[in-house]
């Protein structure tokens, strides 16, 4: 992690440099988040989760994880910061790979603080963006200071009840993997009912290979097992 450049003198390496908060691609928030009680407490009872076949996270916190974050603002801030960091690993790849021609309105469901949506809007010239998340997330959203901020509006609510109407592209980055199949169907049904005719849904999640192999998606799958009531990474099938 660190390099000894002289006896008793140490310097950052490319790895430890990512733990700074002021560098491109910083993973500081991610590193801190996984050491907070919101993560290490459920992971500490992973064996119990495996034996029961369902996450014990709600037993640990006495409430759903999202309600826990609502009551623990510091940990929620680290989580939201980590999700922004995570977006930095995927947003530019998605923006380059996807054809945004003709897209008029992107609605980012569970979009956190807007980094992913902002990145897509830089590629989708002329499109408007709607950021949709829980009230406590939208309320703590930092000011977006780049040129796409004026094209973004924000709204809050519960995506199990409804989502903003009128989008022709709805994005779900690392949302579907948080929930069991029935809950995912409800989210997607609400999107279908809200989108314009001919609208599309873009889901960004890990896709597991059909057979066990050294794939980072399996670690994420374990994290979903530990942290969520029914969430998982899925295969293409």
Q: Where in the sequence are the language-model features?
A:
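Alpha-helical subdomain
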Residues: 4, 100-237
